Each structure stands twice: as structure tokens, then as C-alpha cells.
Amino acid sequence: MPDFFETELRVGEIVKAEIFRKAKKPAYKLWINFGKSLGIKTSSAQITSLYTTQMLVGKMVIAVTNLEPRQVGPFISEVLVLGVDGKRDGDIILITPEDEANIGNRVH
């Protein structure tokens, strides 16, 4: 695991979202476009209480992009999408750029 100052956060756009039926807890499989330098990366996210798959496609997100890939059941999660706890227990709210940001841009 890289140290804090080596953590790479980038803006991505969710281009595909599916229900992760084989996950132990309710989750989605996400495909996120990070532009030319990184391309499309995958992630598993337990965000089903506030989002549908239709709501997620086209959504801009912030993700950690330089972690080792992680096996989540039969799925490989390549990036970690960031979120914050919601008002209700178990709710996760995705962190998104306030204005349109360019896909692949680093977060400073």
C-alpha cells in the first residue's frame, strides 16, 4: 500500500454499472473511464441503498487509482471509489466534483 503522499486520486466517469449478484453484501460492479492515460478500470462498491445502476451511469466520481487490484469474489476491483457516510446507517454518498471536471484529472 502506498503511503499517504503517494496516493493518486483521479476523476472518472462511470460508464457501466451492474448489480453484483455474487457479492456477500449488496453491491454494484462499476466500470469507470479515467481517460487516455488509465483507460477503463473496474470497482466494486456497496452503494446500493442510495443509487440505482441507471443513476450511476454518467456520474463523475473520485477514486484512488494506484492501489493493487483486489479480488472481490469473482470480480477484480482495480480502483477504490470514494464516498462518505450518509445520515442513515449504511448509506454511502459518492464524492463527486462540484463542476464538470476532465476525466482522468488528478485531485489536489
Indicate residue ranges for each PLM-predicted region.
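Phosphate-backbone binding interfaces of nucleic-acid-interacting proteins
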Residues: 1-108
